[in-house]
A protein has these predicted regions:
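N-terminal, intrinsically disordered, polar/charged segments of Gram-positive cell-envelope systems
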Residues: 9-44
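Extended intrinsically disordered, low-complexity coil regions enriched in Ser, Thr, Gly, Ala
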Residues: 63-74
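Bacterial extracytoplasmic/cell-wall-associated proteins, especially those involved in peptidoglycan
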Residues: 62-64, 78-276
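Glycine-rich loop/hinge motif
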Residues: 36-63, 136-144
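C-terminal motif of bacterial Sec signal peptides marking the signal peptidase cleavage site
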Residues: 4-6
Length: 276
């Protein structure tokens, strides 16, 4: 991620290669898994999958159709679980359950009721987000929904575990600097790659709530379903004065963090990036 979108990677033939925030640091594909019982399916949801990608996984594994999963999610009773209290009252959220579908390995009956499938994912998240974590969020002056939103950005930005808490510090520092927007490229991709594909007639509305080059502060909600490492990083950011960072999108995924824009540009140049 290149905060302020200031840099692009230069290739050997002097063309630009833009950063793909979905590029994994480890294997992040949710594949079909063979089970001994033909009536069940074991499904692994990787960290960082969106609600829509989870729906594809369910269809690929015969659990339920993608369309039925999305429909059930969009009409889900948000009063069913206490952990959803924040999102129930949130404004301008496109996918209310985004961020609350915990990434893990599950076993489902094939041709399941999609609402029952969603129940299991949300219930697992509720069990993992402990009272201590809720208290920590409150001590930071943040709601569970806000912490999850930060965690989802961390999940999409970080290439290595060490980068998570540093990225977390950058996000909170920018949030606390009232005149600065987050300007995270991954939120733009969520608008164009998820919201616009699902709701093309609503993208002009939602881009003002999710595109952090446009909106002030956090997007309206999470942009993926983060894992525990990113959630913990959102709850325990490093103590820094950093406002910018650049990450090499190729191994070993080296990164540079800075407190000033000029230093950020220097870091981009040193790492082989060029200002737009």
């Amino acid at each position: 991620m290149l905060l302020l979108g200031a840099c692009q990677k230069k290739t050997d033939n002097d063309t630009t290669a833009t950063y793909d925030p979905d590029a994994p640091t480890t294997q992040k594909s949710g594949n079909k898994e063979n089970t001994s019982d033909s009536n069940t399916a074991t499904v692994t949801i990787p960290e960082g999958y969106t609600l829509v990608k989870i729906s594809w996984l369910m269809e690929d594994n015969g659990v339920c159709s993608s369309a039925d999963f999305i429909s059930a999610a969009q009409s889900y009773d948000l009063s069913k679980y206490g952990i959803l209290a924040d999102v129930k009252n949130a404004q301008n959220v496109c996918f209310p359950l985004e961020g609350y579908l915990f990434p893990a390995t599950y076993t489902f009956k094939k041709n399941s009721d999609p609402t029952a499938v969603i129940d299991k994912l949300v219930e697992t998240f509720q069990s993992r987000f402990t009272d201590d974590m809720k208290a920590k969020a409150a001590s930071m002056g943040r709601s569970v929904h806000e912490v999850l939103t930060v965690a989802s950005i961390i999940e999409k930005e970080a290439y290595t575990p060490e980068q998570r808490t540093l990225i977390s510090s950058v996000l909170y520092n920018r949030l606390n600097t009232k005149k600065m927007k987050l300007q995270c490229d991954v939120t733009v991709k969520y608008c164009t790659g998820v919201i616009e594909l699902q709701y093309p007639d609503k993208i002009d509305e939602y881009k003002y709530y999710y595109n952090t080059y446009r909106c002030q502060g956090l997007p309206a909600g999470p942009i993926c379903n983060p894992g525990m490492e990113s959630i913990n990083a959102a709850l325990q950011p490093d103590n820094t004065d950093y406002l910018y960072f650049v990450i090499n999108t190729e191994p070993p995924y080296d990164s540079a963090f800075s407190a000033s824009y000029d230093e950020h540009i220097e870091n981009c140049t040193r790492m082989g990036y060029t200002a737009k």
